[in-house]
Swiss-Prot record:
Record-linked SUPFAM superfamilies: Prokaryotic ribosomal protein L17
GO biological process, one term: translation
Stretches assigned to coiled coil: none
Classification via Pfam families: Ribosomal_L17 (PF01196)
Designated name of the protein: Large ribosomal subunit protein bL17
Molecular function in Gene Ontology: structural constituent of ribosome
Keyword Mitochondrion belongs to the record: no
Subunit relationships: Part of the 50S ribosomal subunit. Contacts protein L32.
InterPro entries: Ribosomal_bL17 (IPR000456), Ribosomal_bL17_sf (IPR036373)
Record keywords, A-Z: Ribonucleoprotein, Ribosomal protein
Amino acid sequence: MRHGYRGRRFNRTTEHRKAMFANMSAALIKHEQIVTTLPKAKDLRPVIEKLISLGRTDSIHARRLAMAQIRDADMVKKLFSVLGPRYQSRPGGYCRIMKAGFRYGDNAPMAVIEFVDRDVDARGKDSGPTSVETAEAA
């Protein structure tokens, strides 16, 4: 029996799961809307709700806690400068999950997770994999 266990394991180690949710949180803060599988979206919601609640109180301690969770300095800045003030008067429920059909290939249920009152212009194309520029000998 799995009574009292919260969350899913997603067939990943604890470190991998934490890194996955950190990356998904950073992507959601950056684009304000992402498409993922429904179970991942359901488990991401409490993570992002707690981060937005941290963003509502701008303090050094809150910034350090957010940085420990997200690990992306630019997204922490956006969290405290844009998202925190936007949801200052809202007591909770900062994001919504909408079902988006099934993925072709493995028929996994997909979902769109987005911020309530989101900025439509913030959603952009995926930046793709980042590469390190190498210094060429001139």
